[in-house]
């Protein structure tokens, strides 16, 4: 019998697929589940085995996810339409692990549970094909147009446990939690409070708190003078930010497939780190570096969102980000208060910002030199206007 590896989350779609692909497509199905900050690996493995998975592979990849994927997004202030790419960042890692396992154990195909409406089908299949074009890809929910009602009926018929918390479609990892479906799709309604898990609503948040973050080469390394590995620092900031209602995003997102979708995200650590990192950049980098970096940031975010992590162009993008971020060192203090982040002071040895120059009360900057600068700086604008005026006058004469 043919062998297949299924990216398995433990949810309804992928649980049904274990049995369905065996019965209808003739595959022996093995499963792969990764802990990227979201999964109870033991219970998910037991569920896959009970349904009929031949082998169940599980792996804790939180450290790799943090240092090889999230870290690159921190350097690039990764964001798509205001969302910090939490789901999108996890997909290339999942694709990589699936390909490695398929090559090691001889699986002929890899399957995922994505629908034909969403972004993940693109991200999984682009990533896997980029790493190994010979592997066959299967997406039963999409390719055989499986309806949720049909999946539930099939699950009941085959004694597959249907998750009881299925009101919303949720994707969760260290960098954020995304929620969609149910009342969230109704644009006439606010986000139901039962959709939140990581943070409290702003009106229920406490009196606020001040934190200090230390950055080295563009990455956060300490909270309040205590050093952390990146994955633990993120986990701590998710707790701190969550109790202060930091990181709630409710927006309409333009998917790769051209569909608009209302998406709700909880991303406390991502919002805190991105704010702090961006503020330090403004203090340290000059305007030319910031201009170049803004371009790199935008391209990086587009590539990640669109599933192009393994495109050759990502290497120079990331290399440029790493060069610019080698200067991003220092500490920054932030006040977190009822969903808002406020700058509370910063220290560093290489700040381009110079208070003595910016200060109107000192003489360190020679203001007289500005006149000569303006005389030269105006030339491009003034000469082009004069040339066009002259051309119009000659045309009328």
From Swiss-Prot:
UniProt: L-aspartate binding residues: 115, 119-120
Listed GO molecular functions?
argininosuccinate synthase activity; ATP binding
Q: What is its EC number?
A: 6.3.4.5
Q: What class of enzyme is it?
A: ligase
* Keywords in alphabetical order: Amino-acid biosynthesis, Arginine biosynthesis, ATP-binding, Cytoplasm, Ligase, Nucleotide-binding
Q: In which pathway does it act?
A: Amino-acid biosynthesis; L-arginine biosynthesis; L-arginine from L-ornithine and carbamoyl phosphate: step 2/3
Subcellular localization is given as:
Cytoplasm
Q: GO cellular-component terms in the record?
A: cytoplasm
Per the UniProt record, one Pfam family is Arginosuc_syn_C
What catalytic activity is recorded? L-citrulline + L-aspartate + ATP = 2-(N(omega)-L-arginino)succinate + AMP + diphosphate + H(+)
Gene Ontology BP terms: argininosuccinate metabolic process; L-arginine biosynthetic process; urea cycle
**Transmembrane ranges?**
none
- Mind telling me which InterPro entries this protein's record contains? Arginosuc_syn_C, Arginosuc_syn_N, Arginosuc_synth, Arginosuc_synth_CS, Arginosuc_synth_type_1_subfam, AS_cat/multimer_dom_body, Rossmann-like_a/b/a_fold
For the ligand (ATP), the binding residues are: 7-15, 113
**Member of which family?**
Belongs to the argininosuccinate synthase family. Type 1 subfamily.
The UniProt entry, under HAMAP family, shows: Arg_succ_synth_type1
| Protein name per Swiss-Prot or TrEMBL | Argininosuccinate synthase
Native source species: Thermoplasma volcanium (strain ATCC 51530 / DSM 4299 / JCM 9571 / NBRC 15438 / GSS1)
Q: Which gene encodes it?
A: argG
């Amino acid at each position: 019998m043919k062998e297949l590896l299924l990216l398995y989350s433990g949810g309804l779609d992928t649980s049904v697929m274990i049995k369905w692909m065996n019965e209808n497509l003739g595959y022996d199905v093995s499963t792969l589940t990764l802990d990227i900050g979201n999964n109870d690996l033991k219970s998910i493995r037991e569920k896959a085995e009970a349904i009929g998975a031949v082998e169940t592979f599980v792996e804790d990849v939180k450290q790799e996810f943090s240092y090889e994927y999230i870290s690159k997004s921190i350097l690039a202030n990764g964001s798509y339409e205001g969302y910090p790419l939490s789901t999108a960042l996890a997909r290339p890692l999942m694709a990589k692990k699936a390909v490695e396992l398929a090559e090691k154990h001889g699986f002929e195909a890899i399957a995922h549970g994505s629908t034909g409406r969403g972004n993940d089908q693109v991200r999984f299949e682009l990533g896997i094909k980029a790493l190994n074009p010979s592997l066959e890809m299967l997406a039963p929910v999409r390719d055989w147009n499986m309806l949720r009602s049909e999946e539930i009926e099939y699950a009941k018929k085959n004694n597959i446990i249907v998750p009881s918390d299925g009101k919303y479609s949720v994707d969760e990892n260290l960098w954020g939690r995304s929620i969609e479906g149910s009342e969230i799709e109704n644009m006439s309604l606010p986000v139901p409070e039962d959709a939140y898990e990581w943070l409290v609503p702003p009106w229920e948040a406490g009196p606020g708190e001040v934190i200090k973050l230390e950055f080295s080469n563009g990455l956060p390394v300490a909270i309040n003078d205590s050093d952390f590995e990146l994955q633990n620092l993120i986990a701590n900031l998710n707790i701190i930010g969550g109790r202060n209602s930091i990181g709630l995003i409710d927006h309409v997102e333009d998917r790769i497939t051209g569909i608009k979708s209302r998406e709700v995200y909880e991303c406390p650590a991502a919002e805190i780190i991105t704010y702090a990192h961006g503020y330090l950049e403004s203090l340290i980098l000059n305007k030319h570096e910031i201009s170049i970096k803004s371009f790199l940031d935008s391209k990086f975010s587009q590539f990640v969102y669109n599933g192009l992590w393994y495109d050759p162009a990502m290497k120079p993008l990331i290399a440029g980000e790493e060069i610019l971020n080698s200067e991003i060192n220092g500490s920054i203090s932030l006040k977190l208060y009822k969903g808002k982040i406020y700058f509370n002071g910063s220290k560093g040895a290489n700040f381009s910002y110079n208070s003595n120059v910016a200060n109107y009360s000192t003489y360190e900057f020679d203001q007289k030199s500005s006149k000569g600068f303006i005389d030269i700086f105006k030339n491009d604008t003034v000469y082009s206007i004069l040339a066009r005026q002259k051309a119009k006058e000659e045309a009328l004469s």
